[in-house]
Amino acid sequence: MFKFFSSFGDSNEKEIRALEPLVDKINQLENSFTTLSDEALKAKTIEFRARLKNTFETTTAGIQEDITSTTAELAEAQKIADNSKQSRLKAKLESLNKDLSAKENTALNGILPEAFAAVREASRRTIGLRHYDVQLIGGIVLHHGKIAEMRTGEGKTLVATLPLYLNSLLGKGVHLVTVNDYLARRDAYWMGPVYHALGVSVSSIYPMQTPTEELPSRLFDPDYTSEIPGDPWTHFRPISRQEAYKADITYGTSTEFGFDYLRDNLRPDLAQCVQRDMNYAIVDEIDNLLIDEARTPLIISAPDTEAGKLYDVFARLSPRLVVVKDYEINEKDRNAELTEDGWANVEKLLSREGVMKGNSLYDPQNAPLIRHLRNALSAKEFYKKDHQYVVKEGEIIIIDEFTGRMMLGRRYSEGLHQAIEAKEHVKVQQESKTYATVTIQNLFRMYRKLCGMTGTAATEAEEFSKIYKLEVVIIPTNKPAVREDYGDQIYKDQSAKFKAVVNEIDEMRKLGRPVLVGTVSIENSEMLSNMLKRQGIEHKVLNAKQHEKEAQVVAEAGKPGAVTVATNMAGRGVDILLGGKEPTKDDAKVYNEWQAHHQQVLEAGGLHVIGTERHESRRIDNQLRGRSGRQGDPGSSRFYVALDDDIMRRFGSERIQGIMEWAGMDENTPIENGLVSRTLENAQKRVEGYHFDVRKHLVEYDDVVNKHREVIYAERRKILSGADLKSNILDMIREEIITQTAEHTRGYDSSEWNLDGLVTHLNGIFTLPAEINAEALAKLSQEEITDLLTRTAEELYQKKEDETGAGSMRLLERIIMLHTLDSLWVEHLTIMENLRREIGLQAFAQRDPLIAYKNEGHVRFQELLETIKHDVVHNIYRVGIQIQHQTESATAKAASRPVQQQKPLPAAPAAAIPGVSAKAATQSTTPAAKEIGRNDPCPCGSGKKYKKCCGK
C-alpha cells in the first residue's frame, strides 16, 4: 500500500517509510480490538493509564524534583539580576524538561499501537468512520510533535483523535486549536462519541459573552439533553471554564486559549484561575495561525482617557497634503515620510489649528503629533475601505487580507484604528491602556509539545523550523490526486482579466461543472458579482459581509452548474462535496437525487477553481486550488492575473510588460507560458522571504518583553500560591536600609555624613523610636548604624504583625505585593510600547535598533524590579488591615473587563484569522460590600483617595 510514496522527496519518503512497521502493528491489533465489548474497550483507558503511571514512578521522579529545585533557584537569580546564573539555570531547566518529555514520549510510544487501535475501533463503532492507514501515519506524525501536511478532504478532524487520546492519558490535559468557534464546537461534538466510548472527557470552550457568564463552555455528555428546541448541540452540557480545562481534551480557538492565559495572570486568587499548565496542543490550519496570524498580539486593555480631538484635526489635515510634494510613500514597507516642504506645510497647518506647541514640530513636546500624523497618512494611503476594512453600523471593522472575513472585536493598535475612524467620520473610540498582552507566537511556544495540521505547510517549512522548531511531513493522500492545474493566464489590465474570468465561468457551468471563484477583496467579489448578473449567470457570493452563512453556502457549492464567488479562503474548514451536501439516507428520494447530482458532476470533470489574482503567498494560492480534487475526485484550477494586480505592480510586472509588447499582443490576448509562471513564483518567493524576515525580526523584539513577562508572572504565581512573602519583604527592607545608609554615610569622616537625611528618609517608611535620631547615630560606625536600623525595622514589623494578627499580616503582604506588581507592570508595558515605537531612530545614530531595544529594555526592567521593592517597602508599614475587605488590585479588576484582540501597525501586510470579541469572567471570592466612590478614602488604609490607590 506504500508503493505511491516514491513521488515524494527523499527525506519525506524516508520519514514515511520509517513509520510502516508501526502502522503494521496497529493493523495487526485490529481484530483483537474488534472482539472487545464496549465495557472492555472503555476499560483499556484505565489499563493504559496504570501502565504509564508505573513507568513514570520509576523513571521520572528524580527529574521532577530537579525541575522544582532548579525553577526555584532561577526565580531567585532573576530577582537579583544575576545574568550568568540565570543563563546556566535556564540551560539546565531546558535540559531537564527535554529529559522529562523524552521519557514521557518513550512511555507513550510503548502503548501507541494499542491506543491507536482502540481509537480506530471506537470511531468505527460510534460514528462509522475507520481510520485509513495514511490517517494513522498522520496521527503518528502529530504525536511526534511535527506538522502533518494533509490535502483538503483527507480527514484531519478524524486524524486528530489519535494523538489527542494518546497524549490525554498523561492526565495533564491536551488542546485542539481551531480557526473559529464554529469548528471548535463542531469538531468536539462530532468526535465526542469516540472519546466517550473510551472513557475520555472532551469539552469545547466558547467565547464569554458577558463578564458574569458562569457557563461559557460545553462538555460532551450523551446522558444530557438540551432543553432548547432544535438545538444542534443537544448533548453538549453547559459547564464552567474551570471544568472545561479539567477535561482530558479541550477544543477551542487560539484567542480563547490566549485570553484565558492572560486573564489567569490578572486574577487575585489562584482558585479563580482556569487553565492548567500548557502541555500538548494540536493546531488545526497551523499555517494560518503561526504564520499569517503570528504578529497579532492578544491584548487585555481598558480605555485611556487621553487623546481625542487630535484624530479629527489630522483627519482634516491629511487630505490637504499632496503625495510627492509633501510626502513620499513606500508601498513595499507601507510607510510615508514627509518631505522638507511637507514639514513646513504641516507646521503651518498645525499652528493654524492651534495644536502645535512652540515654533517647530521637532520640539520634544510635539512628539505625540508625529505619531498622529503618521497614523493619518497611513490611514489615507494604505488602508482602503472595502479592502482592509469595512464601515458597518458606524464602526470600522477590519477585513482579514487572507480570508476576506470581518474580524469583529479586533482593532488596529497604536492609534491607527482611531485615525481610520476619524478619516471615515465615524465616532472615534477611546484609546486603551494595556493590562496584559502576549503574541500568538509566544503563546504557542509555551506548550511543552506542539504540532499541527494543514493542507499547505511545505512552502513555509523553513519558518516553522527556525522559529518554532517544527518539522513538516507531507502525508500521502488515501487516493491519488487527479486535479489538473492549468497555467496562469496574464492580461494587460483588470477589465480584460475579469471579462475572461466571466467567460470561463459561463463555459464551465454550461458543462455542468460547479465553479468556485476566489477573489482578494470584498470590492472585487461584488464587482464580479455585478458582471455575472449582467450576463444572467446565477451565483452566490461568499464574503465577509455574509460570513454567518458561509458553512451552508460552501457545503452547497459542489452542485451541478453552481457558481460561488468567495473572498479568498472564506469557508475554510468546510469541505465542498461534489453534488452538494450529502443528505442522510432517511429520505430515499432525496438521497437518490443527490447521488445523481454527484455522478453528474464527477462525469463533467468535478469542481473548477478560478483564482482572480495571485496572492503574495504561494501557500494561500495552494489553499484555493486545494478546494478542488478532494479524496481523489476529478477537478481543475486556473489563475488569472493582470499586470496591474498588486503583486505584479510591486514585483516583476515590467519584465512581463516587455514580453507582451515584444510579442505585439493586445489587451484581450493572454500570455500563458513557463517564463511568466516562473516570474510570478519568484515574485511570490521574494514577498514571502520579506515577510519571513519581518516576522523573525519581530520575534526577537517580542522576546524582550516575553522574558520580562515570564519573570513577573512567575513572581505573581508565587505571591498567590502562599509563598513566604514575609522573608522576601524583610529582605527588601534590609536592602533599602543598607542602600540608604551607604548613600547617606559616604566618606571616611562622620562629620560629612547626612544623618538627618537618613533619619528623614527612614521615617518615611516607618516611624523610628525617638531615641534613634541623628545625634545618636553619629556615635556609631556605618556597620553599627546598619545593624541598629535593620534590627529596629524587624522589631517594628513584628510589632505590627502582633497587633494585626499573623493571618491578617499575611493577607496584607499578599495584597500589597500583588497591587504593586500589577500596577507597575501595566506602566512597564506602556514604557516598552513607547520604547519600541521610538527605537527605530537609533538607526540614524548608526546603532542597531534591536540591540538598543534589548539594552534599554533590560535597564527599564531592572528599574521596574527596583521600583517594586521600593513601593512595597514604603507601603507595608503604613497600610492598615482594612485591606482585607478590598482584595482586588487594579489589574485584577481588568480581568473582568472586555478584552480586545488587536493588530499591530504592520511593517508589511499581515494576515489574521477571524477573531471574536472576548470578555473575561471574574468569580469574586470577597463578600459583597458597599460600592466605593472614586473620591472616597481608599479602604486599604493608605490615606489616599480610592481612585489614586486601589481604584486605579
Curated annotation (Swiss-Prot):
Q: Can you say where in the cell this protein is located?
A: Cell membrane; Cytoplasm
What are this entry's molecular-function GO terms?
ATP binding; metal ion binding; protein-exporting ATPase activity
The cofactor binding remark recorded in the entry reads: May bind 1 zinc ion per subunit.
Query: According to the UniProt entry, where is the signal peptide?
Result: none
* Record field: compositional bias (Low complexity): 907-921
Q: Which cofactor does it need?
A: Zn(2+)
Q: Which UniProt keywords apply?
A: ATP-binding, Cell membrane, Cytoplasm, Membrane, Metal-binding, Nucleotide-binding, Protein transport, Translocase, Translocation, Transport, Zinc
Main role?
Answer: Part of the Sec protein translocase complex. Interacts with the SecYEG preprotein conducting channel. Has a central role in coupling the hydrolysis of ATP to the transfer of proteins into and across the cell membrane, serving as an ATP-driven molecular motor driving the stepwise translocation of polypeptide chains across the membrane.
Q: What protein is this chain from? A: Protein translocase subunit SecA
Source organism per UniProt: Dehalococcoides mccartyi (strain CBDB1)
